[in-house]
């Protein structure tokens, strides 16, 4: 454990844990296949027991510690995949040595590597001084740089940033983005500060991170999160580039989610919400899953509810609305609105921008009940963690829960949803659109050229030459007396004839990433007979990928 005895406190890995064999719970895991209980194990086969890869509490409480909650989900996935990891080790070790090696690496993966806790003073506009608290957690450096957002909230704590950093590690692994996980938080309510004060806080926080080596294009790359956006990321990039990164040509790659003029990328603002849409799309169009839920594939006749009308909630609502689904309820911290005939996202966005709240929207009524218990097809919790608990899970009426937020479902609620045959599309897959497009922006900053710029004209000329070649061939074969046979491109081809723009590339790359990851989760769920337990399937995929990196790289310098 390392400790800075000043304004900053740096905590390294948790205390040493035995790396030998892990204990096992007596309860076996319940398998599901197409919504039905799994068949009894064959003679001689023992169902995988729940194993714990640290001293963290299992998912026994309705309101668990957030970081331990994530660790409990990790345990579920690790207990499923451990035997396969042992089987896949191609070494001369004995079976016992292989198993000890696997369990040791799983114990290495699980803790949060570093947590930086710091405080610093700022002078407010009225002349008074205030001490600001902030944190940055780095869960894993199996891939570098680390990646994770910065949030401004009075609820920020060490536990929260550790949990969110660990989720980022698994999230990046699920969608094959080569980053380790990190997360930062500043313990303030941004509504209580002027723009000038927020700029001071953001720039000073950046300098504190830089002094401790917690920010840099190849070290740790923050991004927007709750109550932060392009403006704050621009301040961070400018602060780093003007100081520590003054001589670094890649300095602006120290943060993503920037404005376009500061090295940002088209499509980043809507990326998380668009990713939520694509994630739902991949499962709602899968007939086998819809038959389990008693639903028809597609968005056409579906209703949905959004909890949280921020960046993620707004853009998720936009895309689902565009593809035919109907939003009947939207909720925020100050209240909810309801209209069984549907709520238009653009009209609601305009109203909120003008009035600062969704309450009073003329085309919807105030909803007094719990938004999480509204009768709908799809529920999108896009607010904060631990919203769906043991107490309200039995009353949830949605058939699909799409986790736009991080950690909205507690382990006990997750069990209830499995028992009730409700599909939960997990956070570590569904809201990975943001980090996916952040990866594209980071690469763009390192390449110092926007996507498509080098190929626009070549692709356009090539397409026109292709059309001319087809036209000339047809005229030689079928033309009479030198008559012409004009080739007219369709509207869709005309839109693409000049090649892909940066926005096109970002959108297609995100859609492909979400589709590929969804297929991997489906295959894993089928392979391990998990049925609707998509969360465990996603964790299994993440653990396999992170384990492979540690095992092949070696753990001497971990």
UniProtKB/Swiss-Prot annotation:
Pfam families, per database record: ELFV_dehydrog, ELFV_dehydrog_N
Residues bearing PTM Phosphotyrosine: 135, 512
Post-translational modification: ADP-ribosylated by SIRT4, leading to inactivate glutamate dehydrogenase activity. Stoichiometry shows that ADP-ribosylation occurs in one subunit per catalytically active homohexamer.
Function: Mitochondrial glutamate dehydrogenase that converts L-glutamate into alpha-ketoglutarate. Plays a key role in glutamine anaplerosis by producing alpha-ketoglutarate, an important intermediate in the tricarboxylic acid cycle. Plays a role in insulin homeostasis. May be involved in learning and memory reactions by increasing the turnover of the excitatory neurotransmitter glutamate.
Assigned protein family: Belongs to the Glu/Leu/Phe/Val dehydrogenases family.
Protein name: Glutamate dehydrogenase 1, mitochondrial
GO biological process: glutamate catabolic process; glutamine metabolic process; tricarboxylic acid metabolic process
Binding annotation for substrate: 147, 171, 438
Gene name as annotated: GLUD1
Modified residues (N6-succinyllysine): 68, 84, 110, 162, 183, 191, 200, 346, 352, 363, 365, 390, 415, 457, 477, 480, 503, 527, 545
Organism: Bos taurus
Modification N6-(2-hydroxyisobutyryl)lysine, positions: 147
